[in-house]
């Protein structure tokens, strides 16, 4: 397998895990519960994006205390 294929398979696995995990949640958990679950799955992504808005972080994904206002 090439590197690109391995990355694609990894991302699809993360996506599938996220969908299954989110389906088992109740809607009352809200956005914070979803972010916490994703943070457990892909911690390096959220570390890079936390506290700023960039090409991989098109919207604010952190608590309001550390996340700058968009616009």
Swiss-Prot record:
GO terms for cellular component: extracellular region. Residues 22-37 form a propeptide. It holds the Pfam family Toxin_8. It is found in: Secreted. Keywords: Amidation, Disulfide bond, Ion channel impairing toxin, Neurotoxin, Secreted, Signal, Toxin. The keyword Disulfide bond applies. One of its GO terms (molecular function) is acetylcholine receptor inhibitor activity. Expressed by the venom duct. Residues 1-21 form the signal peptide. It comes from the Eukaryota. The keyword NADP does not apply. Coiled coil: none annotated. The modification Asparagine amide is found at residue 70. Contains 3 disulfide bonds. They are not indicated here, since framework IV presents two different connectivities (I-V, II-III, IV-VI and I-III, II-V, IV-VI). The cysteine framework is IV (CC-C-C-C-C). Belongs to the conotoxin A superfamily. This is Conotoxin Bu23.
């Amino acid at each position: 397998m090439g590197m690109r294929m391995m990355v694609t398979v990894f991302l699809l696995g993360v996506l599938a895990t996220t969908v299954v995990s989110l389906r088992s949640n109740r809607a009352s958990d809200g956005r914070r519960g979803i972010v916490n679950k994703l943070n457990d799955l892909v911690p390096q992504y959220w570390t890079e994006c936390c506290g700023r808005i960039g090409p991989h972080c098109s919207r604010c994904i952190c608590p309001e205390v550390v996340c700058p206002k968009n616009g």
